[in-house]
């Protein structure tokens, strides 16, 4: 029987070199990446460092970072949140919000998060580095990578239950059906309203690069 891989030797070579360069330049402890063909989902490149050689007998690190390591993905998750709002019909076209800081209240009986004009018992959420972008449309909020825009989207337009459903539909927070490769499921953290909001911009909940 023949075994045919989707990996592209040229892509894999560039990926491996890039990971090594990233490790050296940033002095980080680990780095990992996947290159995926958008149209088909084929994995063209897969790598993680530190790596291991199966020919060695004193291996101390077997972790495949791209599939086994769950982490908070950061702002790349904002695209998923926006996509969920768009696909579910909840995207606020031509609406705007006030950026900089998001204060809010939470109704435990309904699960409703509401923006507040003043600080509450819940932790405030700000845009990166405390920047004040002023009033933005939601399109502009995406361009500016506004955390507050995500919070307003989740509070006013995209219900938490719908957001959670779309995370699962996108394949997050669950094992990926790929043969012969172990992979973590990630961790959904919707324990507090701040966690729901933070998940929208890539914090609190964790996923894997493979997902």
Explain the meaning of each model-derived region.
Residues 7, 31-71, 83-211:
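Beta-lactam-recognizing serine transpeptidase/beta-lactamase-like catalytic domain environment
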Residues 1-31:
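Conserved, well-ordered alpha-helix/loop/beta-strand core segments that scaffold catalytic motifs
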